[in-house]
Swiss-Prot record:
Region span, Disordered: 878-905
Post-translational events: Rapidly phosphorylated by CK2 and more slowly by CK1.
Entry-linked Gene3D superfamilies: 6.10.250.2510, Alpha-catenin/vinculin-like (1.20.120.230)
Subunit structure: Interacts with arm/armadillo protein.
Species of the source: Drosophila melanogaster
Modified residues (Phosphothreonine): T643, T645
Gene: alpha-Cat
Topological relation to the membrane, as annotated: Peripheral membrane protein
Protein name per Swiss-Prot or TrEMBL: Catenin alpha
UniProt keyword S-adenosyl-L-methionine, yes or no: no
Record field: compositional bias (Basic and acidic residues): 878-890
Length: 917
């Protein structure tokens, strides 16, 4: 037995000494807590038992029953403790001592409790029982903690075996000895990982659980690399890099083992978690948003102004760094600068309003408007910063394997100069991944997601030099089989780690931002690709086409991963269909056209390149990505969409990238307002309308939305499979929604001609609906249903005609003294009203078509129904709700957590009369 020190007791488990303090009753595992919980409940209930009422005399039956329950529970603890003591000779003496203490305190508790149950009104007896209960719980807790240390002992025993195996691996001098030691290490490490997994599930402290999980993953992941690196070192001991390579992996494995040891003994390997915490810039914006709202009475011109201005300048400095980064597009940089200036101005306006309201208790309308404007401007700045971050992600995570593969190819050739060049490129690539990952973290409030990204980035940072070392070893020993195996192992480890980092980054990047940015990037690349074709640059064409292929593939992968968060439904079906079309049809055609074009340019035979066909294929890629984005956004309400994430800022292909055929020329190049600077399309003009006119349009849109709710309840419930009436109705509804979006300066319709073409599509769909519905009416006997159905068809024809007339909406824009005056309220409201009326007519037509089809069908006259009326299966809720970035802190509030009370602390709250004196 080892001697106890002043702080605690050293318990000798065979050759393993565990230090523990008998006075420290901290419960670290859930199993101890759950085992102790029933006894705590029984004891505290007994202590809280009230005496009989004044009218009645005698014993408390309830107290007597509780005493018996406590005695039985104590007896169970004694039996289990003795069993554990005799099964584990290393701890028998300590366990039996703890069991004796439980017996002693249990007997004292039993006597005190029975005396109390005989006389529940006695304060003295209640106080005696409280002290006895406290002593009993302390003894039982000590017994359980000691029993829990048996599991720790077994874990540490396995851990020491693994440590011995690592020492043998380190000192192995031959391949045979190394392989024998490695097999033994593999078995023992596997057993240690299992025991550590069990311990991880038991631990209460989330930080310790995370540390143990990371250590287990590290031990498991690095085992293969440890083998190959050790084989290289044993085979080529003359190479310094081989030792460096082996020592790095050995240290990683040893660190993992040490972490398991620390956690098993209740020590965190990291006093402060360096990876935790939300992004700095996101947190600064949140703090600023909270700071701008205050009571005007508390506003201080000197203190408040200085504080808010300093906070804002700090945010703008960080935004400027992001704007000046390499991958930030010029257009994005200009937008960030513009938003920073707008936020500055909004803050000055807000501070002026606070100055004017300092003597008022309630906010004036001007102050409320200034606060709203301030919030809007910070939200706009956030959005541009998020887009800038996604710009970097889209570029840096586009091709993550090429730098490594180039490095490996250079290493295989044995060309040291080339390897040095490729190593520099690979290092810059790794540094860029880490830099972008940290940039993504800076704009995220998702603390768990940020922690994962930071940890994955740290792994990339530490692994990069060792990948280069493995390549350098292969360079000087290109024919060595063990060097080749080692390089393959490091390549696989790198690819896995990059995939983990990519997925972690995607998790804290909203898919809406990702798709909006990817769409713009693909548009840029399509322009470059066509330009390369037109100037005959085969190399640039191949490189740019590769970027398009990579971006498109990544869009497909990210969207498929996002759809995994949903249960299968009509929404996911449509999105995945759009992905399938892009991947299997559009990209296949594009790849063929690129191959043909590159081949023709390489052979200097420009005449063989069908430029128009190539441009068509390129345009289809852009349209395919755009269609995926449109499908993803279909389940968003207008409130969920911010204006910059919708379709409005995306411009179509520029003139030089369009086909020269007549099919691709037309209104797309037309400036609808050639005399007005800053406005090109009718949709842009709609955004410039006065706030008063916008409010009136919003009122009309609200009426349209109410009609849309009726449409959803009456039409959307039907399955459109085998029912063209429902299909046409939904198609018309979608176009009408795009039209109403246009009146607010949103949506995919940009020009007046777009709206006119949309009206034509509605009219065509209305004609088809009329024809189909009349066939149903003809089969229906004369009745009020038939008459009403035909009447509603006449309404559809009328309102389709009205929409065609009102679709020629074009806001009148005048420039008076440098100020744009936009007037188009009447035409916009007319279009919305016509759409609302048409939707109402469509709803009624569907209702009466159903009645006519099912209620009045004559027997024997129709071989099969014209349409099939089948209820659509209810759409399932997403397994994980898409998280909007502004919701993380702005709308989601953390509920008060239930505090888990330590049993000893619970009992210490009871105070006996004797203690109080």
């Amino acid at each position: 037995m080892l001697k106890p020190d002043k702080m605690g007791t050293l318990t000798d488990f065979g050759q393993i000494a565990l230090k523990w303090d008998p006075k420290n009753l901290e419960i670290r595992t859930m199993s101890v807590e759950k085992t102790l919980e029933p006894l705590v409940l029984q004891v505290t209930t007994l202590v809280n038992t009230k005496g009989p009422s004044k009218k009645k005399k005698g014993k408390s039956k309830r107290a007597s029953a509780l005493v018996a329950a406590v005695e039985k529970a104590t007896e169970n603890f004694i039996q289990k403790g003795e069993q554990i003591a005799y099964e584990n000779p290393d701890i028998t003496q300590e366990m039996l001592t703890a069991v004796d203490e439980v017996k002693k305190t249990g007997d004292a508790m039993s006597i005190a409790a029975r005396e109390f149950s005989e006389d529940p009104c006695s304060s003295l007896k209640r106080g005696n029982m409280v002290r006895a209960a406290r002593n009993l719980l302390s003894a039982v807790t000590r017994l359980l903690i000691l029993a829990d240390m048996v599991d720790v002992h077994l874990l540490l025993k396995s851990l020491h075996i693994v440590e011995d195996d690592l020492n043998k691996l380190k000192n192995a001098s031959s391949q045979d000895e190394l392989m024998d030691n490695m097999r033994q290490f593999g078995r023992n490490a596997g057993e240690l990982i299992k025991q550590a997994a069990k311990r991880q599930q038991e631990l209460k402290d989330p930080q310790l659980r995370d540390d143990l999980a990371a250590a287990r993953a590290m031990l498991k992941k690095h085992s293969t690399m440890l083998l190959t690196a050790s084989k290289v070192y044993v085979r080529h001991p003359e190479l310094d890099l081989a030792k460096v390579n082996r020592d790095f992996i050995l240290k990683q494995v040893c660190d993992a083992v040490n972490t398991i040891s620390d956690v098993a003994q209740g020590k965190s390997s990291q006093p402060t978690d360096i990876y935790s915490g939300a992004g700095e810039l996101a947190a600064a914006l949140d703090d600023f948003d909270e700071g701008i709202v205050m009571d005007p009475m508390t506003y201080s011109e000197k203190r408040s102004r200085q504080l808010l201005e300093e906070r804002l300048e700090s945010i703008i400095s960080a935004a400027a760094l992001m704007a000046d980064a390499d991958c930030t597009r010029d257009e994005r940089r200009e937008r960030i600068v513009a938003e920073c200036n707008a936020v500055r101005q909004a803050l000055q306006d807000l501070l002026s309003e606070y100055m004017s309201n300092m003597s008022q208790k309630d906010n004036s309308p001007g102050l409320s408007r200034a606060i709203d404007q301030m919030c809007r401007k910070t939200r706009d700045l956030r959005r541009q910063l998020r887009k800038a971050v996604v710009d970097h992600v889209s570029d840096s995570f586009l091709e993550t394997t090429t730098p490594l593969l180039d490095l490996i190819e250079a290493a295989k050739s044995g060309n040291e100069k080339k390897v040095r060049e490729k190593s520099e490129i690979f290092t810059k690539h790794a540094e860029k991944l880490v830099e972008v990952a940290n940039l993504v973290c800076s704009m995220s409030n998702n603390e768990d997601g940020v922690k994962m990204v930071r940890y994955a980035a740290a792994q990339i940072e530490s692994l990069c030099p060792q990948v280069i070392n493995a390549a350098s070893i292969l360079t000087v020993r290109p024919n060595s089989k063990v060097a080749q195996e080692n390089m393959t192992t490091y390549r696989q480890a790198w690819e896995v780690q990059v995939r983990i980092l990519t997925e972690a980054v995607d998790d804290i990047t909203t898919i809406d931002d990702f798709l909006a940015v990817s769409e713009n990037h693909i548009l840029e690349d399509v322009n470059k690709c066509v330009m390369a074709l037109q100037v005959g640059d085969a190399r640039d064409l191949r490189a740019t086409a590769g970027a398009i292929q990579g971006r498109s593939s990544r869009v497909c992968n990210v969207v498929e991963a996002e759809m995994d968060n949903y249960e299968p439904c009509i929404y996911t079906k449509r999105v995945l269909e759009a992905v399938k079309v892009l991947r299997d049809q559009v990209m296949m055609k594009f790849d063929q056209r690129v191959g043909a074009a590159v081949g023709a340019l390489s052979n200097n035979s420009n005449k063989d390149v069908d430029e128009n066909d190539f441009i068509d294929a390129s345009r289809l890629v852009y349209d395919g990505v755009r269609e995926i984005r449109r499908a993803v956004l279909m389940n968003r309400s207008s409130e969920d969409l911010d204006t910059d994430t919708e379709f409005e800022p995306v411009e179509d292909l520029t003139l030089e990238t369009r086909s020269r055929s007549s099919a691709h020329t037309g209104d797309q190049t037309v400036d609808e307002y050639p005399d007005i600077s800053g406005i090109c399309t009718a949709r842009e003009a709609m955004r410039k309308m006065t706030e008063e006119d916008k409010q009136k349009i919003a009122q009309q849109v609200e009426l349209f939305r109410r009609e849309k709710l009726t449409f959803d309840s009456e039409v959307a419930k039907w399955d459109d499979t085998g029912n063209d009436i429902i299909f046409l109705a939904k198609h018309m509804c979608m176009i009408m929604m795009e039209m109403t979006d246009f009146t607010r300066g949103r949506g995919p319709l940009k020009t007046t001609m777009d709206v006119i073409n949309a009206a034509k599509k509605i009219s065509e769909a209305g004609t088809k609906l009329d024809k189909l519905t009349r066939e149903i009416a003809e089969q229906c006997p004369e009745s009020s249903t038939k008459k009403d159905l035909l009447a509603y068809l006449q309404r559809i024809a009328l309102y389709c005609h009205q929409i065609q007339i009102t679709s020629k909406v074009k806001a009148d824009v005048q420039n008076i003294s440098g100020e744009l005056i936009v007037s188009g309220l009447d035409s916009a409201t007319s279009l919305i009203q016509a759409a609302k009326n048409l939707m109402n007519a469509v709803v009624l037509t569907v209702k009466y078509s159903y009645v006519a089809s099912t209620k009045y069908t004559r027997q024997g006259t129709v071989s099969s129904p014209i349409v099939v009326w089948k209820m659509k299966a209810p759409e399932k809720k997403p397994l994980v709700r898409p998280e909007k970035p502004e919701e993380v802190r702005a709308k989601v509030r953390k509920g008060s957590q239930k505090k888990v009370q330590n049993p000893i602390h619970a009992l210490s709250e009871f105070q006996s009369p004797a203690d109080a004196v």
